[in-house]
Amino acid sequence: MLTIYLYDTDKWDETIKLVDTTSEYGLTGCIIASHDEIIKQTTKKLTHSAGNFYINDKPTGAVVGQQPFGGSRGSGTNDKAGSELNLLRWVSVRTIKENFEPPKNYRYSFLKKE
């Protein structure tokens, strides 16, 4: 289903709330906008609106196995099936770094007095 909604610019906040609350489904979504601040605000307000979210691009053509893909809300569990991101649901990620040549000076070079 494709929904296109034309709105009055003075009702932008109301329109974004309508977009975010109208549907119980959220497979993909997109916004087309030219102002960076509007893009930033809209993306933030629609964080949970769709599993895949596109900015100034068509909301189709995700390649399973190459691009994480999965819906949110009634469109799925947002697991991103077909990608390694799906594994994150089943594991507890831990990053370990080992340095084989420990530094002798623990000060950051940018903190040196000139």
Residue locations for each model-derived region?
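Conserved C-terminal structural/oligomerization subdomain of aldehyde/semialdehyde dehydrogenase
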Residues: 1-114
